[in-house]
C-alpha cells in the first residue's frame, strides 16, 4: 500500500508535505503533491492532513 494523490483535488497547500514523517511527499513544478513510493511508510499522516481529501492510502 502507498499514498496516492488525486491531482484533480490537490490544491498544493503543502499540508501533506509538512506532516509526512518520511519526507516522501513533495510539490512538483505545477504545485501538485507527488509521493516517492519507495519512501512512503503507508502511515496515513498525509491522508489525515489533507483538507481536500486528495490523498488516499491504496
Swiss-Prot record:
Residues 2-30, 31-58 form the 4Fe-4S ferredoxin-type domain. The keyword Kinase does not apply. Its cofactor is [4Fe-4S] cluster. It comes from the Archaea. [4Fe-4S] cluster 1 binds at residues 10, 13, 16, 50. InterPro entries: 4Fe4S_Fe-S-bd, 4Fe4S_Fe_S_CS, Fe-S_Ferredoxin. Keywords: 4Fe-4S, Electron transport, Iron, Iron-sulfur, Metal-binding, Repeat, Transport. One of its GO terms (molecular function) is 4 iron, 4 sulfur cluster binding. Signal peptide: none annotated. SUPFAM superfamilies: 4Fe-4S ferredoxins. Pfam families: Fer4_7. Gene3D superfamilies: 3.30.70.20. [4Fe-4S] cluster 2 binds at residues 20, 40, 43, 46. Binds 2 [4Fe-4S] clusters. Ferredoxins are iron-sulfur proteins that transfer electrons in a wide variety of metabolic reactions. This is Probable ferredoxin.
Amino acid at each position: 500500500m502507498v499514498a496516492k494523490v488525486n491531482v484533480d483535488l490537490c490544491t498544493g497547500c503543502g499540508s501533506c508535505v509538512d506532516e509526512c514523517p518520511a519526507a516522501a511527499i513533495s510539490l512538483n513544478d505545477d504545485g501538485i503533491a507527488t509521493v516517492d513510493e519507495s519512501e512512503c511508510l503507508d502511515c496515513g499522516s498525509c491522508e489525515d492532513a489533507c483538507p481536500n481529501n486528495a490523498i488516499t492510502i491504496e
